[in-house]
């Protein structure tokens, strides 16, 4: 009997493979994206110190209305503004094993437009 692969397990495997190749430093931290069915979360992480430097998600009060893609744009804008306020201008983009399409792409484009370089 053929079993259908679990999409999330395949994504996690892809994410582990990519994470082995990229890491965030204090000079160039990692912009991590997590996408759930209902929301999207973004963190700017310094992997050397193991510290989250800035974050934004659909749980924030500023992000409440609109479609999921519109919310992703607002989250990208917020995380970029918070990172730039802390003096971070360059990051390494970690798409979390997700395809660079839809909400993930919308978040990345909004972060670029608001001052983050990657």
Curated annotation (Swiss-Prot):
Keywords: Ribonucleoprotein, Ribosomal protein, RNA-binding, rRNA-binding. InterPro entries: Ribosomal_uL18_bac-type, Ribosomal_uL18_bac/euk. Residues 1-25 are annotated as: Disordered. Pfam families: Ribosomal_L18p. One of its GO terms (biological process) is translation. Disulfide bonds: none annotated. Residues 10-20 have a biased composition (Basic residues). It comes from the Bacteria. One of its GO terms (molecular function) is structural constituent of ribosome. One of its GO terms (cellular component) is cytosolic large ribosomal subunit. HAMAP family: Ribosomal_uL18_B (MF_01337_B). Belongs to the universal ribosomal protein uL18 family. Part of the 50S ribosomal subunit; part of the 5S rRNA/L5/L18/L25 subcomplex. Contacts the 5S and 23S rRNAs. This is one of the proteins that bind and probably mediate the attachment of the 5S RNA into the large ribosomal subunit, where it forms part of the central protuberance. This is Large ribosomal subunit protein uL18. It comes from Streptococcus gordonii (strain Challis / ATCC 35105 / BCRC 15272 / CH1 / DL1 / V288). The gene is rplR.
């Amino acid at each position: 009997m053929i079993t259908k692969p679990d999409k999330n397990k395949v994504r996690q495997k892809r994410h582990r493979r990519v994470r082995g190749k990229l890491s965030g430093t204090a000079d160039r931290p990692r912009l991590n994206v997590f996408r759930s069915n209902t929301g999207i979360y973004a963190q700017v992480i310094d992997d050397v110190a193991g510290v989250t430097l800035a974050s934004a998600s659909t749980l924030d009060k500023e992000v409440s209305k609109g479609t999921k893609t519109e919310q992703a744009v607002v989250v990208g804008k917020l995380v970029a503004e918070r990172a730039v306020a802390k003096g971070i201008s360059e990051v390494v983009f970690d798409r979390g094993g997700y395809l660079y399409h839809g909400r993930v792409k919308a978040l990345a484009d909004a972060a670029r437009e608001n001052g983050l370089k990657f």
